[in-house]
Structure formats: C-alpha cells, structure tokens
Curated annotation (Swiss-Prot):
Its main location: cytoplasm. Residues 1-44 are annotated as: Disordered. Residues 105-160, 195-340, 421-474, 512-660, 687-712, 767-848 form a coiled coil. GO terms for biological process: cell morphogenesis; cell population proliferation; cilium organization; flagellated sperm motility; gene expression; manchette assembly; nucleus organization; single fertilization. Keywords: Cell projection, Cilium, Coiled coil, Cytoplasm, Cytoskeleton, Differentiation, Flagellum, Phosphoprotein, Spermatogenesis. Transmembrane segments: none annotated. GO terms for cellular component: axoneme; centriole; centrosome; ciliary basal body; cytoskeleton; midbody; sperm flagellum; sperm head-tail coupling apparatus. It comes from Rattus norvegicus. This is Coiled-coil domain-containing protein 146.
Amino acid sequence: MEDRSKYIAEESEDEEDEEQEEKEKKGGASTSTETEEDQEDIPSVIVPTINIREERLVDLAQTPAFLCLNELHTSGKLPGTRMAELKAKYTLLHDTVVSTQESEVQLLENAKRFTEQIQQQQVRLQEADDFPNVFTTEVSKLREQLLKYQNEYTAVQEREYHTQYRLNSLTEEKSLVLKEFEKIPKPGEIEKKTKLLKESTEELRKEVIQKRLEIKNLREDVVSKQKQLMKEQKELEELMDYQVGLKDDVVHHQSVPVQITKEIEKLTRRKIETEKKNVVLEFELKELSDSLKKLENKVSALAEERDDTIKEVEGKRTLLEVKEREYGQLLKLLELTKENEASSLAERGILDINLRNCLMDKQNYHDELSRKQREKERDFRNLKKTELLLKVSLDALSQAQALNQRLLLEMEAIPKEDLLLPEQRKELHKEVDLAKRNLAQQRSLSEAEAKLVEQQIAEENKLLKEQETMREVLFNLGRMTQIKMEEKEQKAKDFLKSQRRYCDIIKEIKSKKLEIRLYRKRKREIHRRLKEFAGLYDAIRNERNKFVNLLHKAYQKVNEIKERLKMSLNELEILRSSAVSQERKLQNAMLKHSNNVTIRESMQNDVCKITAKLQEMKEKKEAQLTSMDRLASMITVIEEEMVQLRKKYEKAVQRRNESGVQLIEREEEVCIFYEKMNIQDKVKLHQDIEIHILEEKIRFLKLKVAEKQRQICVTQKLVPIKKSLDANLAVVQIQFSQCADRIKALEKCFVNPDCQGRVRFIPGKDLTEEEMIKKLDMLELQLAKKEEKLLEKDFIYEQVSQLTNRLKTKTQACKMDTLLLAKKMNSYQKKIKDVTQEMMALVAELSMKQALTIELQKEVREKEEFIFSCSSRIEKGLPLNREIEKDWLKVLRDEEMYAFATAEKTREYIDTDYRQLPNGVYTTAEQRPNAYIPETDATLPLPKPYGALAPFKPSEPGANRRHIRKPIIKPIEI
C-alpha cells in the first residue's frame, strides 16, 4: 500500500508539471520566434512518465501474495496442494509481467531514438526553409504560420495520447485499489475482532498463569510426597524382610511336629492295610487255584477244538486254491482269444490302409517320373542352346583377338615422329615469337608497319588461343562420347541381365506352381489317411474301453476274494490271541502269588522297624513341644508389630490416593489441550493419507500400464515363434502316443498274476509265541520302573517349585533397584563414550593443526631464505634468477588469462540473456543447427543445409534408381 501511495503521489506531481508546461506553451504562442524555439525543444512523441516498479528485482517470497498464502496455510484455511498451485500461477504471472516490462522498456528506448531522429530531420527542414533570411515575404510568413499550427496540432495529439494512456493506467490502478479495498475488513469489524482476541488472549494468559502456579504447587507436593513415600517404603521393605524371615522360621518349626504325626498315621494305616491285604490275598489264592484247574480243563478242550478246525480249514483252503487256479486258467484263455481276435482285426485294417497307401504312392511316383522326364528333355534342349551360344561367343572371341593383334601391328607401324609433333610445334612457336620480337625491335621499320606487325601478332595470338580452346573442347567431347558409349554398353548389359533374371523368375514361378500342386495333392492324401487312422483309432479305443471294463470287473472279484480270505485269517488270529491271553493270565496269577509271599515277608520286617522309629519319634516330640512354646511367644510379638505397620501402610495409601486424585484432575485439563492438538494432527494426517492413496493409485495404474505393455511385447515376440511351437506340438503328440503304449504294456503286466515282479516279500524271521511273551514281560517291567522314576521326579519338582516361588518373590522385589542401577550405569557409560569421542576428535584436530603449523613454518623459512638471497644479489648489483623471471611471467600470463576468461563469460552470459530471434523475441535457448558437414574424403568439408526436414540429413536416392551409375565427382584443386 505504501508503494501504491508513492506511485499515485508521483503521478500527481507529473500531471502538475505537464499542466505548467502547457500553460507556458499557450502563453508563448503569440510570437513566431518563441513558437519555433518551443517546437525545437518539444519532442514529437511524449514518453509516458509512469513510475513502473522494477519486477525483476522483487523477491517473490516477500511479496504480499506469498505472505498471505503462507498465513492462510498456517491457519489451516488453505491446503498445501492448493497453496502450491496458487504460488505456481503467481510466479507465471510475475514472469509474464517481467517479460512485458522488458519489452516495454525496449519499446520506450526505440521511441526515444526515433524522436531524436525526427527532431534532427525537423531542424534540417527548418534550416532549408530559413535559407533566404534577408528576404521576408508573405509566403515565408504563411509557411511559418503553417508550421506553427502543425506543431500545435502535433502537441495537442501527443497530449491527448498521453492523457489517454494516463487515464487507462489510472483506471487499472483504481480497479486494483477497489479490489484491495474490498478485501480489507472494515475498521469496526477489525476493532471488534481485536477486542475479542485481546480478551481471549488475556483470559488464556490468566488461565495459563494459574495452571502454571497450580502445576508448580502440585510438583512441590508430589516431590515431598515422593520423598515421604520413599522413606516409608524403605521402612516397610525392612519390616517385610524381617517378617518373611520370621514366617519362614515359624513355618519350618511348625511343619516338624505335623510331619511326625503324619508319618505315624501313615505307618499305622500301612500296617492295617497290609493285614487286610494278607487276608484278601489268601482268599484270592484259593480262588486262583480253583480257577487254574478250570482253565486247564478248558485249555485242553480248546486245544482239541483248535486242531479239528485247523484240519477243516486246511482242507477247504486246498480245494479253494485248486478252484482258483482253474478259474484263472480259463480267464487267461478267454483273454488270449480276445486279444488274438482284436490283434488280427487291427492287423487286417492296417494292411488295408497300407495297401491303399502303396497304390497312392505308386501313382505319385509315376507322376514324379513323368515330370522329371519332361524336365530332363527341357534341360537337354537348353544345353544344346547354350552349346550353340558358346560356339558363337568363341568365334567372336577369335575375331576380336585377330582385330586386337592387327591394331597392335598398326600401332607399331606408326612412326615415332608423330609423337614428337607437339614438341616440334612448341619449338616453332618459340622461334616465331623470337622473330616477331626482333622484327618489332628493328628501328628501320616505320610506325605504321610496326603497328601492323603488332596487330598481326595480336591476331595470331588470339587465333592460337582459340585453336587451343577448340582442341580442349574437342578432347572433352571425345572423352564425353567415350563415357556415353561406356554408359550405353553398361545399360545394354544391365538390360540383358534383367531379361535373363526375368526369364529365370518366370521359370521359377512355373516350377513353384508345380510344387504347389504336388503339395496340395499330398495334403489331400494325408487328410484322407488321417481320416482312416481316426476311424481305426476310434475302433481301437472302443475295444480298449471294453477291456478296461472287463479288468475292473476282474479287480472287483479279486478284491471280494481277498476280503473273504482276510476275514478267515482274522478269525484265526482272534482264536490265537484268545489262547495267548489266557496263557498270560495264568502266568500273571502265578507271578502275583509269588509277589504276595515276598510282600508279606517285607511287611513283617517293616513293622519291626516302625516300632523302633515310634519310640524315637516320641522322644523328639517332647523336645519339639518345648521349642513350640518358645516360638508362640515370639509370634505374638511379631503380630503386634504387624498391626502397627498395617496402620502406617493405610495412612500412606490414603495420602497416595489424594495425590492421585489431584494428578488425575490436572491430567484431564492437560488432555483437553492435547486433544485439540491431536485433532489438528489427525486432519493433517488424513490429508497426507489421501495424498498417499492417490499417489499409490497412480503408481498402481502405471504398473498396470507397464504390465499390459509387457504382455503386448511378449505376445508380439511369440507370434514369429508359431512355426517352432507347432513343430514342438507335433513332437509332444508323438511322445504322448508312446507314453500311452507304455501305459498299456504296464497295465497288462500288472493284471498278469504269473508275473514275478508283482509281489515283494518282507525280509526277516517271525517271532515265536515264547519269544513274544518274554518281550512283553520285559516291556511291562521297564514301564513299571519308569512310572516309579516319574513319581520320584514329581515329588522333587513340588519341593523345588516351593523354594523357587520364595526366591521369585524376593527377586521381583529387588528388580526395580537393579533396573534403576542398570539405567544409571548405561547413562554413565554413554557419557564416558561421548567424552572420549570428543577427546579423540580434539586430539585429531590438534594434530592436524600442528602439521599445518609445521608446513607453514617451513614455507616461511624458505621464503625468508629466498628474500635474503634476492636482497644480497640486488646489493651486489647482480640480476635476479631466471626462475623468478619465469614465475613473474607466469603470474602475468595467469592474470591475463583470468581477465580474458571473465570477459568471455560475461559476453556469453549477455549473449544468452539477450539472444534475439527473427520474430523479435529474446530467448536464452541455444540456436538449432541449420547445416551439417558431410563426411567425405573427395570433397571439402563445407557445411550443407539440412533442407526442409531439419535436423535430418537429405536422404539418398531410392531403390528404383540404383541401377543408374552415379557420376564420379572430380576433386577440387585449390
């Protein structure tokens, strides 16, 4: 706004100056001399005096538009993408304004130059008009008046143009000012907004101050509470440790009498149980002996029945095997007859097809033989023709050789004097010239005769020159005729070649047509054969399907027989297993009896030991009762201390709860502020996510496009490989047919029951019944031992888990302390590392600086020695060294080169900045090349224009003009 006000003030001052100038012009129009002087001063075109701001020097980041956009973006009214678009548009507009300003400045300079030229021309005209200054006539007065009125008219026109220009600029400024004025809010609204903002800021400031004070107070309270809590926690931990120790002692002492009583009860129970077991075992022994007798009787009966059943099963099995063999043989015979029938039918069909094919092949071979005989006759005729041509060419060759020999003889017969004629002619010319000179130099001749002689000499020279030119023309014409003859011969040869090619091509076309007919016939035959083979294939496939169905039925029957066999075997195994189980039961009963006897003896020994232990336990019980009384008194004291500690703990919990409530209230207030911040962050994140989604969509679409293009390329590449793929398909079909034949052969081998490789027996020996029983007993004993070990491990695990739980509680209590210590240690280690790194860096810098100082000291010493030597030489009157002179010359040369380089850079920069195109526009782009240098050795490397389609070189002549011989370009002699 300040710039705009300055701009308007300057314009008003310019307008006042112009009005004063106009008044002065009107006042001085009374006299003719004054008008003429004014006309000389006033230019014909007045340049508009508008104070245009220099846009090139403006910083875009500090413009009001950019500042306004940044404010809107920070306030959240404008998104980032929209801001970037508006900034880009503004920069484009700014660039256009700068370019228009530059063009305007150039136009103004041109206008100034033209006005100066017009003024000079007017001065010259006036001087020409004022030529007769002495004489003053009516014509001169009228001319002066006319000039005055013309000048006034031009001044009025200029003023009108100037005012119109000023008016347009002012209207534009007015529109801009109005737009800005509309954007500017009203003072009342601004005051209201400012008041509201001030009030809100004051309220927020007060609230912030209050909150800060409250936070400070709360922090102080929290610090004090934390200190108290730390003290109380330490006291509580000490008391808890003491309490845990006491509890452990109490538990340890309490568990001793309880364990003793439990052990006594266990022993009494065991005693009673063993007595009961003895009674039960005796009763079971009697029952087992009775059952053993019954089982023995049953076993004998079952053994007899088993023998009978085994005999019956073996007889039936032999019968079944015989029947199965007969059935299998019959099936084989049936299958063989069917196979023979099918093979004979297939052979008959194949023989029919082969017979037809042989007939067709015979016909084809006959046709080929007739065709080849015709070709042979044609070739024989061609051979005769070529032999005739060869004879003619040989005769022509002999004639040409004779002619050549005759010409050579004639050449030898020509005298050598004819060859020396040009030299003799030159010598005669020289003698004539000498005679002419001598004649001209003779004094006895008169002037007229001398002139005649000179004229004749000049005419003679002219005639000689014409003769030489004519001779050269004749020689050139001879050469041209020779070249034309050669071209004619070449064209005739080319014509003959093309005729021969034409004939050959016609012959090839005919032969190709015949081949095409033959291939078509073959194709028809192949199609016919394929149809026949297809019929055969269908018949074979139907037969194969029948055989497959029969095979399936046979498989079903075999499976049924196998199932029956399995059922019978299972029944046999069930009977065997029942017999084995009964034998095992008997053995187990015997083992139990022997175990019971041993257990009874061991129990008697245990009873004796328990009585001895009971006496010892009674003595221990009395000693432990005394210790129990002492521990009970200690427990009462500890319980009283525990009650006091619980009261202290409850007080500390109340304090903690109060401070927690206060902290929650403050946290809620802080959360409100954080929520506001989070809302803004979420909005920003949402927009970023949308942008990211759009970018991903674009990337995905690009990938799709690339994939489609790749697929297109792949399909385009696969098109030319079609023939090779068809060939591969044929090979694969052949392999498929071979595989099908192999599968049929394998199926036949699998169906055949007499095949040796059909069954595979498992190696090794089968165990006997006794070995199996022993193995089972061993496994049972191992299982019992493992169960005992597992029980022992479970008991140990329970005791260890109790101890570990106690240790775990203690370790969890000490975890926080160790964590804090570890954190402190880590922080201290980090600090130490940082300090060491800084120390190392400083040491490295110091060493570098020391090395630099040493180098500089060396340089200083060298310079001092050099200066000392120079001063000593100057004192002695000796000249300086040549090396110094060379160095000085190098310095001067470097300065000159640097100055030249800077001047060239500035010139290039000016050229690039102010490069003018033919249409008057300035550009910084490099000029496009309009010509190229041809890569030829014969001609000079002169630039040639590109032509209509730059930057492409003109193309060579097409294929239809290749038979024409290119003219040989003569090299330019410089």
